[in-house]
Amino acid sequence: MIIMLSPAKNMKNIEVFDRDLSLPCFIDNTKEIVENIKTFAIEDFKNKMKINEKLAVLNKNRFESIKFDRLGNPAILTYDGIQYKNIEAENFTRKDEEFANSCIRIISGLYGVVKPYDSIYEYRLEMQTKLRVGEFKNLYEYWGNRIYKELIKEKTAIVNLSSNEYSKSIEKFIKDSDTYITCTFKVNKNGILKVESTQAKKARGMMTKYIVKNRIRDIEELKKFNLEGYKYKENLSNNSEYIFVKE
């Protein structure tokens, strides 16, 4: 079972991590994208990434500091969004880290696919950014089916715990013979079921932690997830979407 996660816009620097890190599988592609972005002026960052001047300066400096001559930090500890705060990877044991690295894959506009303990640098680059790379007019076109092929090579189920922006990068390549399941988290508001962005990110993080801590490799075991009031709803779910509702 492969767990597919989104990255996070917010990132943090890790002072000390004393375990070996691996390099992302598409590091040569990453270098190509970085060299492209290093030509950007501040205005390019602002316009293409839809960010303010302060963030544009920060990210220009981040990209200019990427040298690839030294290791960065572990991906799962560097991403700092709501989902990652609820994974709580800083509390993982060595066995947790090994299990997480075997099944979690983070989809990234810059790196393509990263394992939790791959080395990454701090950056900001959303998959939906209209960034031309060579002959490709955006990152979806640039990555093409490479992300899908990397995930599916394990010949096992893919569990989608990512946002639409990132799941979109592989869904058009999914075949009928593939086992691809999206976990959707909804809240019951006066009898109306809604996906609330913040709650969904939090739940995806909790589900990821639940999978790691319980060493889950069978998709049927996902249905037992019941943290913070969520319950699997058989009547709302199907073979490609597991729906969990918080009453």
Curated annotation (Swiss-Prot):
InterPro entries: YaaA. Signal peptide: none annotated. Transmembrane segments: none annotated. GO terms for biological process: response to hydroperoxide. One of its GO terms (cellular component) is cytosol. Belongs to the UPF0246 family. This is UPF0246 protein CD630_18230. It comes from Clostridioides difficile (strain 630) (Peptoclostridium difficile). The lineage of its organism: Bacteria, Bacillati, Bacillota, Clostridia, Peptostreptococcales.
